Curated annotation (Swiss-Prot):
Assigned keywords, A-Z: Aminotransferase, Cytoplasm, Glutamine amidotransferase, Repeat, Transferase
GO cellular component: cytosol
Catalytic residues in the record: C2, K603
PROSITE patterns the UniProt entry points to: GATASE_TYPE_2, SIS
Family annotation (InterPro entries): GATase_2_dom, GFAT, GFAT_N, GlmS/AgaS_SIS, GlmS/FrlB_SIS, Ntn_hydrolases_N, SIS_dom, SIS_dom_sf
Protein name: Glutamine--fructose-6-phosphate aminotransferase [isomerizing]
Function field: Catalyzes the first step in hexosamine metabolism, converting fructose-6P into glucosamine-6P using glutamine as a nitrogen source.
Source organism of the structure: Rhizobium meliloti (strain 1021)
Enzyme class name: transferase
Compartment(s): Cytoplasm
UniProt domain SIS: residue ranges: 281-422, 456-598
Length: 608
């Protein structure tokens, strides 16, 4: 969500702060701002909209200073306006914040009763006023910071400047991540190591409850009670270069076409293609002995987990409990400490997923992380890390991370089946051969279907509602298709299990309703054809995504049929993801939306 950066050193910082913010654009934002201290005075520039607007403002009114903080805001309290953009100022205090101050209304009333005048609608402004109040009461800067942290409740990553201290940035973390970068004669602060990669690869991650005093030559870190603590330094592998679009119009398009390559890379970490076998999974989690598995995630990662559930239950005969992370820990699930739990998150910082992880950890479960960011909080707090190795994914709507999550889950399920003795050596070899074929088939599909997809997408762009249907692993894929379409084209779409059509959604079917049916010719195909006949009988416009055998067997008059190669069931979800992603992408292009940064969405959701 919001992005935070800070620099304290001997060189001008404003341009470097904006460059660092560009590396956080993938998180999503609606306004931005920078504050520096120059000649003993706090100064700031803010702008609504994209960073180019802030850059334009800085060209007109440059900011000097060798210390500063900057922020990209994703609105939670108050409209996305320049007035509500961070940094917030009051009485010589500047604050930027990622998170939600849950008791801000109570604090605001208290501060207003004491004479504080609020200029914005945000929850963050109470932090600045609290700090100013404690300074007026005679507390020093560190004491004021500690006192403020004792009062605020909720999730926060904070960076603070005091006008009377032009050599120090203060920071605090409770929930959203913060990384401190160590330089030569200068220090850095960022929401993640990616923002700091051009400046340093030596990183210290704050943990929940930590707060820090950062100077030019070092940092002092304290826990919530004010005790001095040490946090380890580590070398970050985050790339120092900004990823570009290459010859593609959008990052999302580029990332769709990268899938054959990144999936081949990911699978190479989990399977031995020469011997056609899976490599040993994990020493930390014994999949051969766990009685059950819990999976929790959000959004697209949750839908990957739903598909993974089918695989673990089918190939490993392992019972799987799965729920969206925002609900998982509220259900009081009877969890066995002998069991294991997998948490799926591209960023590794998803707040609800992290909270569910900690819930399972408290109950004694072994924890596995399926993440793209190996230095993330979820990875660091897990017993075993299963990297998806998708590389940087900039588009807010997940594409290559989704299919890499699926590839890793498929390999883990086969490995679990081998460990549990539920698949034979011959079955293992056959499944691995199918996985090995996947990158080639994906490349073949991507090179052949675009003209048909573009034609169909032009028609979809004129629709107001779209229904997706699927059975088996195609059911979560139908939900993913609907999610992708509404995320980036803003067309209302819903994904349903095909067997649920008669239990409500069929009431929506008419001649204006496109129904996208994902139906490889598998053991569910005949039943799905029956559902398509029900749609056709009511004038619905069927778009069938199937394989050669399915196209021949359906015998239906469809609006469009997209024909894919026949593949093994274990790789079908990844292959059938491709037309689903391209349909959403090209429809959004025809709609003229911001494909890479759709409205109201954030790449990394770091608050609950």
């Amino acid at each position: 969500m919001c992005g935070i950066v800070g620099i304290v050193g001997n060189q001008p910082v404003s341009e470097r702060l904006v460059e660092a913010l560009k590396r956080l654009e993938y998180r999503g934002y609606d306004s931005a701002g920078v504050a520096t201290i120059d000649a003993g005075t706090l100064q700031r520039r803010r702008a609504e909209g994209k960073l180019v607007n802030l850059e334009s403002r800085l060209r007109e009114e440059p900011l000097a200073g060798t210390i500063g903080i900057a922020h990209t805001r994703w609105a939670t309290h108050g409209a996305p306006t320049e007035r509500n953009a961070h940094p917030h100022f009051t009485e010589g205090v500047a604050v930027v914040h990622n998170g939600i101050i849950e008791n801000f209304a109570e604090l605001k009333d208290e501060l207003a009763a004491g004479g504080a005048e609020f200029q914005t609608e945000t929850d963050t402004e109470v932090v600045a006023h609290l700090l100013a109040k404690y300074r007026r009461d005679g507390l020093g800067r560190r004491e004021a910071m500690h006192a403020m942290l004792k009062r605020v409740k909720g999730a926060y990553a904070l960076a603070v400047l005091f006008e009377d201290d032009p050599s120090t940035i203060m920071a605090a973390r409770n929930g959203p991540p913060l990384a401190i970068g160590h330089g030569s004669g200068e220090m850095f602060l960022g929401s993640d190591a990616i923002a700091l990669a051009p400046f340093t690869n030596e990183i210290t991650y704050l943990i929940d409850g930590d707060w820090a005093v950062i100077g030019k030559t070092g940092v002092h870190i304290f826990d919530f009670d004010g005790n001095v603590v040490e946090r380890p330094r580590q070398i970050s592998t985050a790339a120092a270069f900004l990823v570009d679009k290459g010859n593609h119009r959008h990052f999302m398009e580029k990332e769709i076409y990268e899938q054959p390559e990144v999936i081949a890379h990911a699978l190479g970490h989990y399977v031995n293609f020469i011997e056609n076998r899976v490599v040993p999974i994990s020493d930390a989690i014994d999949f051969g002995k766990v009685p059950s598995l819990a999976i929790s995630a959000c959004g697209t990662a949750y839908l990957a987990g739903l598909i993974g559930k089918y695989w673990f239950e089918r190939y490993a005969r392992l019972p799987v409990e799965i729920d969206v992370a925002s609900e998982f820990r509220y259900r009081e699930i009877p969890l066995s400490p002998q069991s294991a739990a997998l948490f799926i998150s591209q960023s590794g910082e998803t707040a609800d997923t992290l909270a569910s992880l900690r819930y399972c950890k408290e109950h004694g479960l072994k924890i596995g992380a399926v993440v793209n960011a190996r230095e993330s909080t979820i990875a660091r707090e897990s017993d075993a890390v299963f990297p998806i190795l998708a590389g940087p994914e900039i588009g807010v709507a997940s594409t290559k991370a989704f299919t890499c999550q699926l590839a890793v889950l498929a390999a883990l399920a086969v490995g679990a089946g081998k460990a549990r003795g539920t698949i034979s050596g011959e079955e293992e070899q056959a499944l691995v051969k199918s996985l090995a074929e996947m990158p080639r088939i994906m490349g073949q599909v991507l090179n052949s279907i675009q003209p048909k997809i573009e034609s169909l997408s032009r028609e979809l762009s004129k629709c107001h509602d779209v229904l997706y249907l699927g059975r088996g692993t195609s059911f979560p894929l139908a939900m993913e298709g609907a999610l992708k379409l509404k995320e980036i084209s803003y067309i209302h779409a819903e994904g349903y299990a095909a067997g649920e059509l008669k239990h409500g959604p069929i009431a929506l079917i008419d001649e204006n309703m496109p129904v996208i049916v994902i139906a490889p010719h598998d053991r569910f195909f005949d039943k799905t054809v029956s559902n398509m006949q029900e749609v056709a009988a009511r004038g619905g416009r069927i778009i069938l995504i199937t394989d050669e055998k399915g196209a021949a067997a359906s015998k239906l008059d469809t609006m469009h049929t997209i024909v894919l190669p026949e593949v093994d069931e274990i790789i079908a979800p990844m292959i059938f993801s491709l037309p689903v992603q391209l349909l959403a992408y090209h429809t959004a292009v025809f709609m003229g939306t911001d494909v890479d940064q759709p409205r109201n969405l954030a790449k990394s959701v770091t608050v609950e």
